[in-house]
């Protein structure tokens, strides 16, 4: 068994969609990035790749490659799942936290969990998505960006 940890952060910007865990969330700002900037899925991808010692999201999906421009990060997670499977690993669980002052994420967490579980071919009970604020402190508190942390457990298949 191996544990992996992932972290991602993106800047908030008007005129962009806010996508977290593959769910489009109504908000006046979205996350700026080369892909859809889904910080939650990016953190999970990095955690999975790190646990298997298979690099990181930037190595596999560089922002210099136009094929990943505005790509749905669920597709990136699906590719990461395939990379792990081909290397002989399977996912036991995912535990993640999104750090955002706004918007309120609780109404969307069930769908995020289902999306992640579906792509990883595990049960939604094996996926935890939590949300927290920074009580107005730092870049998240000033609503300049959103970050996500993820921890995963994998084992040889």
Curated annotation (Swiss-Prot):
- Return the EC number: 4.6.1.12
Q: Which gene encodes it?
A: ispF
Q: Which cofactor does it need?
A: a divalent metal cation
Provide the protein name: 2-C-methyl-D-erythritol 2,4-cyclodiphosphate synthase
What SUPFAM superfamilies does UniProt report for this protein, alphabetically?
Answer: IpsF-like (SSF69765)
Q: Which domain of life is it from?
A: Bacteria
Q: Which PANTHER family match?
A: 2-C-METHYL-D-ERYTHRITOL 2,4-CYCLODIPHOSPHATE SYNTHASE, CHLOROPLASTIC
Quaternary data: Homotrimer.
Pathway(s) served = Isoprenoid biosynthesis; isopentenyl diphosphate biosynthesis via DXP pathway; isopentenyl diphosphate from 1-deoxy-D-xylulose 5-phosphate: step 4/6
Single GO biological process annotation from the record: isopentenyl diphosphate biosynthetic process, methylerythritol 4-phosphate pathway
Q: How is the cofactor bound?
A: Binds 1 divalent metal cation per subunit.
Q: Name one Pfam family in it.
A: YgbB
Catalytically driven reaction(s): 4-CDP-2-C-methyl-D-erythritol 2-phosphate = 2-C-methyl-D-erythritol 2,4-cyclic diphosphate + CMP
What would you give as a GO molecular function for this chain, any one? metal ion binding
Query: Metal-binding: present as a keyword of the record?
Result: yes
Binding-site positions, 4-CDP-2-C-methyl-D-erythritol 2-phosphate: 8-10, 34-35, 56-58, 61-65, 132-135, 139, 142
**According to its UniProt record, which protein family does this protein belong to?**
Belongs to the IspF family.
Which species is listed as the source? Syntrophomonas wolfei subsp. wolfei (strain DSM 2245B / Goettingen)
Q: What does this protein do?
A: Involved in the biosynthesis of isopentenyl diphosphate (IPP) and dimethylallyl diphosphate (DMAPP), two major building blocks of isoprenoid compounds. Catalyzes the conversion of 4-diphosphocytidyl-2-C-methyl-D-erythritol 2-phosphate (CDP-ME2P) to 2-C-methyl-D-erythritol 2,4-cyclodiphosphate (ME-CPP) with a corresponding release of cytidine 5-monophosphate (CMP).
For this UniProt record, the keywords arranged alphabetically read as follows: Isoprene biosynthesis, Lyase, Metal-binding
